[in-house]
Curated annotation (Swiss-Prot):
It comes from Lachnoclostridium phytofermentans (strain ATCC 700394 / DSM 18823 / ISDg). The keyword Cell inner membrane does not apply. The lineage of its organism: Bacteria, Bacillati, Bacillota, Clostridia, Lachnospirales. One of its GO terms (molecular function) is phosphoribosylamine-glycine ligase activity. Its EC number is 6.3.3.1. GO terms for biological process: 'de novo' IMP biosynthetic process; adenine biosynthetic process. It is found in: Cytoplasm. It catalyses: 2-formamido-N(1)-(5-O-phospho-beta-D-ribosyl)acetamidine + ATP = 5-amino-1-(5-phospho-beta-D-ribosyl)imidazole + ADP + phosphate + H(+). Keywords: ATP-binding, Cytoplasm, Ligase, Nucleotide-binding, Purine biosynthesis. Belongs to the AIR synthase family. CDD domains: PurM. This is Phosphoribosylformylglycinamidine cyclo-ligase. InterPro entries: PurM-like_C_dom, PurM-like_C_sf, PurM-like_N, PurM-like_N_sf, PurM_cligase. Its main location: cytoplasm.
């Protein structure tokens, strides 16, 4: 008996590392001090001397059961983008600049080519957010995961000058809410998605005119990364007073998280375009509207609050940055929470 017969192929692990190196190297920043394959990753902070109080911000998350679609369709090149997005978008909500990222892949069987493909998506997400992929772990766990399945999670660290932390404390009556469009369902609520739609390859490969693509393509569309969009507001001297990444819990759970006590968010449902996939999901699943807004982003992946005088400028800057943004409501005095009308 040996380790390989027990289900763990060390040589496959070495091969996977070699295959993923080219993807990782494309994410490197000058501040990275260590190479691939060490016990830890090191990142220098000396280039941030202009900050009065350099403050680290962090985020960790996974992709969740969206992975099941990747398994069914045998498509693994974009799921890593979702993993990065779920972490760096949270950092961006605090005003942070992502610095580096680490991934964790646990699988039933280490297939080097598949692992490298997954990491290529992680690397793409890192490039989109200007974060260095400085480390990771691939754990082969036979008997724990089915041989064709894996789990994917990650951890990101960013930096912000403490005085520029986005906390919501400056919110006042009359501030404007701007919603930045999502790319689709993103990475939450897929347990419900999988109950509504038939999770078979034939069904997922069915083309729908209303979706302008197959169901599988639309459901696997990567989570949008908003780092560069929010950076465009910084460079354009627009102060973001509050920011919310609309993930699990939808509008009702996430928007209140960006508010201080004593203010409420008034959001108008008819102020923006809801993507067709949400209408299809709601109809086919007979899901109540409130449940939809309490589960999904409903077409708004990031919500920000700015001063009324900056609202039009913010929308314009976001447009130049390649985003679709809508003025969707305002902040009013009242009990902390959200009014969807």
């Amino acid at each position: 008996m040996d380790y390989k017969k027990a289900g763990v192929d060390i040589e496959a692990g070495y091969k996977a590392v070699e295959l993923m190196k080219k993807h990782i190297q494309g994410t490197m920043r000058s501040e990275v001090l260590t190479g691939i394959g060490g016990f830890s990753g090191a990142f220098s902070l000396t280039s941030f001397k202009d900050m009065e109080e350099p403050t680290l911000v962090s985020g960790t998350d996974g992709v969740g059961t969206k992975l099941k679609l990747a398994f069914i369709l045998d498509k693994h090149d974009t799921i890593g983008i979702d993993c990065v997005a779920m972490c760096v978008n949270d950092i961006a909500c605090a005003g942070g600049e992502p610095l580096f990222f680490l991934d964790y892949i646990a699988c039933g069987k280490n297939e080097p080519e598949k692992i490298a493909t997954i990491v290529s998506g992680v690397a793409e997400g890192c490039k989109q957010s200007n974060a260095a992929l400085i480390g990771g772990e691939t754990a082969e766990m036979p008997g724990f995961y089915p041989v064709e399945e894996y789990d994917l999670a990650g951890f990101a660290v960013g930096i912000v000058d403490r005085k520029k932390l986005i906390t919501g404390d400056k919110l006042k009556h009359g501030d404007v809410l701007i919603g930045i469009a999502s790319s689709g369902i993103h990475s939450n609520g897929y347990s419900l998605v999988r109950k509504v739609f038939r999770m078979e390859k034939e069904a997922l490969n069915t083309y729908y005119e209303s979706l302008s693509g197959t169901l599988g393509e639309v459901l696997l569309t990567p989570t949008k990364i908003y780092v560069k969009a929010l950076n465009s507001l910084k460079t354009g001297n627009v102060e973001v007073k509050a920011c919310s990444h609309i993930t699990g819990g939808g509008f009702y759970e996430n928007i209140p998280r960006m508010l201080r006590e004593g203010v409420t968010a008034i959001v108008k449902k008819d102020s923006y375009v809801i993507p067709p996939i949400f209408h299809m999901l709601q109809k086919d699943g007979s899901i109540e509207e409130q449940m939809m807004y309490n589960t999904y982003n409903m077409g708004i992946g990031m919500m920000i609050a700015v001063d009324k005088a900056d609202a039009d400028k913010a929308v314009s800057l976001l447009s130049v940055a390649g985003e679709t943004a809508y003025i969707v409501g305002e902040i009013q005095d009242g009990e902390k929470g959200i009014c969807l009308c």
